[in-house]
Swiss-Prot record:
Its EC number is 6.1.1.6. This is Lysine--tRNA ligase. It is found in: Cytoplasm. One of its GO terms (cellular component) is cytoplasm.
């Protein structure tokens, strides 16, 4: 059984609720990266597991856009220093293209969720507070101030100040919430008196966005407000004495609510060189979800995140993304094989889990096994078939190349062609930004490389080019011909390959050579190996 099915089953048995609400949330203080997406996709997987079992369930997302800007992040201009302490929803867009700072970072993520197959109801904290959804919780927190302080202090080395109040007020003059302090609460008329470092002081009702609960009180309050029954959380929140531990007690003793079941997830680390570093918007170590959808299929991101348990950390290497796509393609082939197999045989647990995983990570399952052209090969084809003036890929050239590599383009469905074209453009961008750009040497560069070769390699180049004149060029024929001609001249095949890569790319290595040469025009291959083109 896949972990998402097992988790949803466990939660349903424990809670036995009429309706389940699975929640996730993010503070849009910077670029929302694939590490953040792990929380939302984990929630989505468990939610889908509940639906599979016939349960009534909802999936919600809380955008914590009423949190303050905490510091001047490296990606912000110096002038944004004046906004530190203001709610993210009230700060202008750093590039002037969105309604607010929060929207600038939030909207690309929300827009990508549809591509990722996530259907979710979004609640923005700033709108919820301003609409009065937290008003009752604010009163409850203020009237139970000392009890909340006692609960929080039991987990703290240093107790909170005796005059602490569980409320952050947005100053009506300067708009900041990190420099205000509540100095009194009047339980009769439900007003608070606050002072701000800017010199402003006022007595107001702390409702409809005037006040915001601090995180350790806000979280259990929202569980109650939205009826949350399950929520993924990072290991920092789930640690002993963390905000989940205090949240359990505040939810039960202050808001009379049972805390949701926790689902702890590990970080996704971004591999930079030989080091793997935890992703963090504030540190600038990020790979945004919107960037993923430019270089790879959304279902492959779901596959990366959901194939293993959430408690397993993931090292993500951008240079190895082609291997990840290969693994997804292998799962896809296995899925359609097992769908046929189960018509006549009973599948074992491992086979059923493969079916569950593919269905979970693939939002739109094709009717039959679609065309699969390896991602790395697509990156090569895309660069060869690219019109440098228009930056468009010549699909007729692509079909010609594939025809010489064992494919039959006449059998491609419209779905196949559409998916192939997407993969070509995505893999081209990947090769350009993160992989290896395919830059074929010009003739002068090829001649320079030629002079570095042994006499045996030079003789082989001429013999090989002569033989190519007499064949119909395709990947297998080219591959066999390279071995045959090298063997005849007593040249190690490896040396023939090195000679080919050097006069083509100026390197000792390169893409799979048979497929690569079959992707080029026959006249060019003959001319290059003769050093005339």
């Amino acid at each position: 059984m896949h972990w998402a099915d097992a988790t949803s089953e466990k939660i349903m048995k424990k809670r036995n609720a009429e309706e389940y609400v699975v929640s996730s949330g993010i503070t849009p203080s910077g670029h929302i990266h694939i590490g953040n997406a792990r929380e939302t996709l984990t929630a989505d997987a468990v939610y889908k597991g509940m639906l599979k079992k016939g349960a009534e369930a909802k999936l919600i997302f809380i955008a914590d856009d009423y949190d303050p800007l905490r510091k001047l992040y490296p990606f912000l201009p110096k002038e944004f220093e004046k906004y530190i302490g203001m709610p993210l929803s009230e700060i202008p867009c750093p590039q002037g293209c969105c309604k607010s700072y929060a929207d600038h970072f939030l909207m690309p993520f929300l827009n990508s969720l549809e591509d990722l197959g996530v259907e979710i109801t979004t609640h923005r904290a700033n709108e919820c507070y301003k609409a009065g959804m937290y008003n009752d919780a604010i009163i409850t927190a203020l009237e139970n101030r000392l009890k909340i302080k006692e609960l929080l202090d039991s987990y703290r080395k240093e107790p909170l100040a005796d005059d602490w109040y569980p409320l952050n007020v947005v100053c009506e003059k300067c708009g900041k919430m990190h420099e205000t302090k509540v100095i009194n609460y009047n339980s009769e008329d439900k007003t608070i008196t606050y002072v701000c470092k800017c010199g402003f002081e006022n007595t107001v009702k702390p409702f409809n966005g005037i006040g915001k609960l601090p995180w350790r009180v806000d979280w259990p309050a929202r569980w109650n407000i939205f009826g949350v029954t399950a929520e993924p959380m990072g290991k920092d929140h789930a640690a002993s004495g963390g905000s989940y531990d205090t949240g359990i007690k505040i939810a039960r003793q202050i808001f009379n609510y049972q805390a949701p079941e926790k689902m702890v997830y590990e970080w996704i680390q971004l591999k930079v060189g030989d080091k793997a570093m935890p992703m963090s918007s504030s540190s600038g170590v990020v790979f945004a979800v919107k960037d993923w959808t430019e270089i790879c299929h959304p279902e492959v991101l779901r596959f990366l995140i959901l194939k293993g348990k959430p408690t397993k950390h993931i090292d993500f290497d951008l240079k190895a993304i082609s291997n990840l796509v290969d693994d997804y393609d292998e799962l896809e082939r296995k899925y359609f094989e097992l769908i046929e197999k189960q018509k006549t045989e009973e599948l074992n647990d491992n086979e059923n889990e493969k079916i569950s995983l593919y269905e979970l990570v693939t939002p739109k399952i094709p009717e039959r096994l679609p065309l699969q052209v390896a991602y790395r090969f697509c990156s090569i084809i895309a660069q060869i078939a690219l019109d440098k003036e228009t930056q468009k890929i010549d699909m007729e050239r692509v079909f010609d190349i594939l025809g010489r590599n064992g494919y039959n383009p006449a059998e491609f469905s419209e779905y196949d062609k559409s998916r192939l074209e997407k993969r070509l453009y995505m893999s081209k961008k990947w090769a350009s930004d993160y992989g290896e750009n395919l830059e074929i040497n010009d003739l002068d560069q090829a001649k320079e490389q030629y002079e570095t070769l042994s006499e045996e390699q030079k003789a082989w180049l001429k013999a090989f080019s002569k033989e190519v004149e007499n064949i119909e060029i395709d990947a297998n024929t080219i591959h066999e011909l390279m071995y045959e001609t090298a063997t005849k001249l007593n040249l190690a095949p490896k040396e023939a390959f090195v000679a080919s890569y050097k006069i083509l790319l100026g390197k000792n290595y390169g893409p799979k050579l048979g497929s690569f040469l079959a992707s080029l025009k026959k006249e060019f291959v003959i001319g290059r190996f003769n050093l005339t083109e």
